[in-house]
Amino acid sequence: MTNTSNRSAKFLLLFLSLLSLHAAWGQEEGDSSWQLKGFVDTYHAVRSEKPNDFMSSRTRVRGEIGKSFGSSTLFVSFNTTHNALLKGRTGFELREAYLDHREEHWGFRLGRQLVIWGVADGVRIIDLVSPMDMTEFLAQDYDDIRMPVNALRFFVFNEKMKLELLAVPTFEGYKLPTDAENPWSVLPKNTALHLVWNEDGSSPKLHFSNIEYGGRLCFTLPGVDFSLAALHTWNKMPMITYRSSGNHMTVSPQYYRMGFFGGDISKPLGQFVLRGEAAFNVDKHFSYKPEAGAMEQKGFNTVNYLVGVDWYAPYEWMVMAQFSSESILRYENQIAQPRHQSLLTLNVSKKLLDSTLQLSNFTYFDLNHEGWFSRFTSSYALNDHIQLSVGYDWFGGNEGIFGRYKNNSEIWAKAKYNF
């Protein structure tokens, strides 16, 4: 039996086992505090331009297991994935595994978990704790892009206030696509020298001095929610360095300490919700232009902010617009990013057929380079368990982060079964 057949058999066996456990636990739901749920999804994308090759082809089983005992909850979630295009992504992945305990006015959560800060939608201003999986760039669900971290979180709260203290002992950075077979690779193509990705020794070591730490103070008041936050962290998106050696060039990621303090605010006004978010980044590092050569890296302070408005319109329409901008203080010409970098997002959706069909579009528009990424989606709920989706990812522009992928526009289809 081939390796592919072995993986397929294990995949099917795991799925059938989860269904059996789900059925057995469902029969004892009244007597048991165990909970099992999850989903199976399959996603396939084809480039809309020649050579019309596959951009993605993966099938996944997500399992989520919870156990409640008194004021505590144990939660574990995992993925088992078969990726036909990126063989290295095939296998088992522990997603979350944490212990959560809550008392009347305090609590804690210890373990591998997702940490979500701020009110921005698909844009990172103060949401800098959890890194991002950019293996397929932004052409996947944002919930799959955000990565969990090993964190210790302590909470103190009442009806109007919540204080969160956070420590992340182990470093995890962005997961970047560096495989030449990956159409979303961040490495340049058609280079004179062969590129070799080497991240050995790049990540911060497991030392007490390298711990990330911070806190967030949230207020829920009549007519307005807002928070203040601060974090001593690392740049999760690494700076890329190139060093030539003989007949090849070594490409390595570099990580540097940085920090921020900022906050967010959200205020409902009838059918509208106004949102804002801002951060002052300290010692943030940036990639340099190629002509900068081996110039020594240094940190810069930046001001990053976002304003947004959501309209929950009649007849199940929803429109969400955001404008964000980052300004680098004491700018120097070797920095590859513009002094003022701005991004506009627009999210429009409409539900039809008794809310079983949803048509939506989410667009990022790079105002500096006039590039864009627009995801059109049509999603139909066949029943309470099965959802079918088709869509088109449209990239455009000649420069910037979206222009890099202007030939990666794709047609995609997805099926999802929830259990």
PLM regions with names:
Residues 34, 71-76, 106-108, 160-163, ...:
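Repeated loop/turn-to-beta-strand initiation elements of outer-membrane beta-barrel proteins
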Residues 28-48, 72, 76, 359:
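Transmembrane beta-strand segments of Gram-negative outer membrane beta-barrel proteins
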Residues 66-184, 218, 222, 397:
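Outer membrane beta-barrel
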Residues 38-40, 76, 110, 154, ...:
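Membrane-embedded beta-strand positions of outer-membrane beta-barrel proteins
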Residues 53-59, 90-95, 104, 146-150, ...:
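Residues that define the transmembrane beta-barrel architecture of outer-membrane proteins
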Residues 266-364:
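Detector for outer-membrane/organellar transmembrane beta-barrel domains
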